[in-house]
Amino acid sequence: MYYFVTASKDASIYLQQPTQNTGLDEILEVSKVYYGNLKDTARSLIKFETTPLSSSIASGEVTMSNAELILRECESNEIPNEYSIYAYPISQSWDMGIGTRFDEISTDGCSWENRKTSTKWLIGSASLESSGSFNGKGGM
């Protein structure tokens, strides 16, 4: 049996654009790029509404022993032959926002610095009890 849960909200955040929001952008970015001595990092935030799934598991309607996160790549450049992507839980609520990467630039919503428009992320508040990772084979 398959049970699909799609993201209820998502956004990419950028080290070099620390207040920019991309909640309405159609692309999620994960990257680490160097421009000379300048490092730019992009991370993706993805929220899944899991309450219905939790209820279905508790009632016995859904039984499962594992889960998969399926992401697709597009416009990849200079991917190394081997790489790892890690997933961590976010311990704070965040606003998806209304911005896009290049067309509708906005600072409303989450960003590298803020989890909501004017609310900073709390540093060191995450629980690293659970995580996920992917070790992929890349290259073009």
Where are these regions (language model features)?
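Secreted, disulfide-rich extracellular signaling modules
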Residues: 1-140
